[in-house]
């Protein structure tokens, strides 16, 4: 059966019953229908063991390696072995849902439901973020039209408009055409909503007051004498914040096995920081003994950003890290073509295992215990599975087979037991770089220690920006690397575990509201495009309202 067909066969429990499982009363949630709710703020606090499990992965194939599916299956498995558990996930963007992925709520018997609602409009968070982003853009252009009291240089506005769909035609636009009453003409562009700074701010804010402070710190552009202009200067921070007041609150849903799940926030890990909201993670820690969360793409992207950006905001490091690997991805890294990944090839798998080894070492560098989850696919052979287990054993790390797509939590009880054992071990977390290190030092540490590269080259523009940041006092902020997810390098075709490569930083984007500086590398884009055959072509809805084609 297809994912959506499996999900449609399960009758969800009332969201009030799911809330009760999590220790929440009806007065502590606002219901969005019978199967969704938002938590009220401030978050409730129970006495729990506060074990935090981070799920990350190796560099993926274009289809993804099932990290969300493993996260959900692991959460169900922990519940099955008697542990108080909460799952925290990012919410899907319509861009990949309609584009390449077709959905982002897990798969098979490890899904969060109602999957149709979550994949589409859910509780409206994405639309609120899009509206807030574009309201700010409109207010900026209106300020310029109405006399430009702040002296904003329209050539140096860095705030773009946003849309929650992949639309390459909107990457570069010209606005303000049509005469004097239609605004001041200038170049503009669109980012996908999940790349908006407001998404990062939403995911890192602790409460409304923190949200408003962060919104006010946003740098929207520069004056003619190159001084930064902020939202506070425009005096619109309150208006933007009130548009996000409900989006700030975590969303409560359930898995197919009725484990409570918080699905909130959705920044991509290749062009943003790739973690669900701090409030959702904190809610899980406050309500359950074990909170399972994921970070986008591989340990080089979401994993690194979780450790260096999210951990300080959450206030707790992971007690254990699960690295998801698949036989097919390891063979891809070993040189096998995409169309041949279903054919047994132990030699190629062993060659590609270096990518897994690199991610293991990258996560161990933070001082936290690691286990590998082999996400099982039907084409995997015993010889290939044993080869991965042997490789990991040589590194002193357990590799546990998990069939979460086919069996749900039942297929991950061994993984759950391994995670419980890891959480009982001491964790000695340490960040990759000192907090007071400058941007170049932090970038060099990420490139050499996490990616395995040798050098960093900066474009002339990036070098000018670094000098500006130093003058503004921004040169000690955390850095958020925007990089391809397919390779440890900035070249998506350079697979495996390359060494000696150079990362090319072409431009920086200061995101003071989020509290970090984005470094754009290679050819990474903040507005993706749709593939030749977008998933939307296979979607439909029947006359009686039954949805098909989501997965």
UniProtKB/Swiss-Prot annotation:
Xref: CDD domains: FTHFS
Organism: Lactiplantibacillus plantarum (strain ATCC BAA-793 / NCIMB 8826 / WCFS1) (Lactobacillus plantarum)
Stated name of the protein: Formate--tetrahydrofolate ligase
Catalytic activity: (6S)-5,6,7,8-tetrahydrofolate + formate + ATP = (6R)-10-formyltetrahydrofolate + ADP + phosphate
Keyword RNA-binding attached: no
Lineage: Bacteria, Bacillati, Bacillota, Bacilli, Lactobacillales
InterPro entries: Formate_THF_ligase, Formate_THF_ligase_CS, P-loop_NTPase
Pathway of action: One-carbon metabolism; tetrahydrofolate interconversion
A GO BP entry: tetrahydrofolate interconversion
Transmembrane segments: none
Binding site for ATP: 61-68
